Amino acid sequence: MSHHISGVTLHPEQYPTDRHYPFNLPVFRQTKQLRFEFPVTFFAGDNGSGKSTLLEAIALACEIHIWRKHEFGRYEVNPYEKQLFQHVSVEWINGRLPGSYFGSEIFHDFRRILDVWAASDPGQLKYFGGKSLMTQSHGQSMMAYFRACYSRRGIYFLDEPETALSPNSMLELMDIIQVNSEAGHAQFIIATHSPILLAFKGAGIYSFDQSPLRVIPYRETAPYKIYRRFLIDR
């Protein structure tokens, strides 16, 4: 198995503010470097801990396009919200590679855009199993996307892919990740709350529940502890 980026460096001395998110989070002020020693790395942490924010920042620093949802007017706008990537350096092993970013929040927009493309070029759907993603359930369309997208050499970012997936589908996603990472062409960095996905064998898990960030064993993750306690109490 191989991987394409060996680590990233954060530059807190360059941050434009220490009062606004995400630059006010201790994990981003106290963490200088993350090492990626395995083809699959997970970011685990509570809501608001910064895991999805860092995932997106690394993807942008890798020059990977991220689909953007249409944003309606907001009561309060944080001008620093999407700037973290400007202060992240990526350490490539053999030069920059392409990849993709999956976000559950923006996947619905992607499905609709794909349908627009398919109206003029139905062949677009062959890549995703030959059926419109809009005619399938959310979970089914996500699995069609996952089956199609990771066979090429690259680095792949997934933000909470467990959304809308059944336990069986999560196990299938783990199989997809395992096959493509073991083939040596794909590296995955995944933000998740799922104790099922976090159980992926041979992965590194960064915990965002303490600062600075550090790699922890699976059984020390909060999702594992919480689900285990819940099931024992039943």
Named regions from a protein language model:
Residues 40-42, 53-119:
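ABC ATPase nucleotide-binding domain signature region
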Residues 168-189, 193-234:
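C-terminal lobe/lid and adjacent interdomain/linker elements of RecA-like ASCE P-loop ATPase modules
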Residues 50:
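Conserved glycine(s) of the Walker
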